[in-house]
Amino acid sequence: MGKIADCLMLWIPLLLGAIFLCSADPQNNQAPLQLSVGNPLTAFTAPTAFQSGVSHIQSMRSNFDTDVLVSISQGVQDFALDLLQRISVEVEKANKDFMISPFSVWSLLVLLYEGSEGETRNQLKKSLRINVEDEKLRGAYKVWSSFLNITTSTIEVATLQAIYTGKGYPIKNNYRDAIQNYNVQPMEVDFYSPDSVIQINEDTNRTTRGLIPYTILPQDVYGAKMFLLSSLYFKGQWKFPFNKTLTREEPFFSESGEVIGKIPMMVQEANFAYVSNVEGLDGYVLELPYGTQDRLAMIVVLPKRGFKLNDVANNLKALGLRPILQRLAAFRNRASEDNEVEVMMPKFVTATDFTLKGVLIQMGIRDLFDENTANLDRMSSGLFAKLVVHSTKIIVDEQGTTAGAVTEAALANKATPPKFLLNRPFQYMIVEKATGLLLFAGQVRNPKAA
């Protein structure tokens, strides 16, 4: 007689992502167990306001080894750029825009790492670039969550890790203790009742402020054992808002130089930092800051003539963000206050849904998805992952972000401002600059107007 699987699903919103974990116990004939990544409702009912940029982060680090935090942040960044590059390859033929939240995916998988043993744990550790002991990893996450959950007049960031468990389903005490370090308190629900779907969707809707309102269907969780939720919400006003009266219809070009169509292009002239010669990148870099604290920014990379988005994504994977952020910081330090740049950028809305199982297997996380080899015994007995789903949405307009001819971003003569024309495919990353954490990343190939 064949095995009857019990499953666990993970879901992530504004991210929304999900991993479907199953039990291969032949004596257990109950319905699937699910893990979901969603929004920050219960864990952070009132995100803490941050003080001033770097000084706040330094205060959060006062009781934590800065070198360890930098090392772990670098690991998250390496995972993020690896994931971004692989998805870029996947979507190139479809010629579609996409957006992901690498930090939310990483955070969700860390919950599984905490529950894993043996080779499953080794594969997760290697892929997630975890290079420290568990206690230091947990400490780093506490620091991140403290300054990522912020609310000001110009920026709002909120995170959530949540675990819903079926009535009577056991979670091992050591795992329950471990996940408290990620601000997770398991919530017991009845996965056979429609009320569980209502609760998860309401949590997701509230955390993502309505961006991803109703993602879970009754059949997704019916009879589940566990549902893990990890989400990240971001809304930021540009430091230099675009003037709506200047927005105009302009052609947008494909990578081959063909006109895709006319779309609303925003125009702004301000003191933006830019870099045109990062060695090995093959792209021009522009920084669009959010708010007034100089902590969060959209980093835009426009491929140089003769190079494609996949080239840039592959180069970023090798280079990392550090040299780019250092070059941008050096530009800001030496640039005069009247060093203005003219930026033309499309308004766009991107909503994407990914099944990440194949990509994660490519990244070396194999045993997690194999009922014969998966080892999540620190969490509960006999589970394996069935599915990983990731849903995102981003809106970019004149106020900011809520998650002609083909031209290079060449510098004009000194009589006129340099021009950065984003009228052809480009890549963007929303970054917490002090740590280098890559919160969101995506590509615009065929924009839909906001």
Swiss-Prot record:
Broad class of where this protein is predominantly found: secreted
Signal peptide feature range: 1-24
Quote the subcellular location field of this record.
Secreted, Extracellular space
Gene inactivation phenotype reads: RNAi-mediated knockdown results in spontaneous melanization of the tracheal system in larvae and pupae. Displays melanization at the 2nd or 3rd larval stage and affected larvae die a few days after it first occurs. Melanization is first detected between tracheal cells and the overlying cuticle, then increases in intensity and spreads to the epithelial layer of the affected tracheal cells. Increased expression of the antimicrobial gene Drs in the trachea and fat body.
Keyword check for Transmembrane: no
GO cellular component terms listed in the entry, alphabetical order: extracellular space
**Known InterPro entries for this protein?**
Serpin_dom, Serpin_fam, Serpin_sf, Serpin_sf_1, Serpin_sf_2
User: Which residues are sugar-modified?
Assistant: N149, N205, N243
Tree of life domain: Eukaryota
Q: Indicate the family of this protein.
A: Belongs to the serpin family.
Q: What does this protein do?
A: Serine protease inhibitor which plays an essential role in regulating the tracheal melanization immune response to bacterial and fungal infection. Acts by negatively regulating a protease cascade involving Mp1 and Sp7, that functions in the activation of the Hayan-phenoloxidase (PPO1) cascade.
For this entry, the protein name equals Serine protease inhibitor 77Ba
Whose protein is this, by species?
A: Drosophila melanogaster
Upper taxonomic lineage: Eukaryota, Metazoa, Ecdysozoa, Arthropoda, Hexapoda
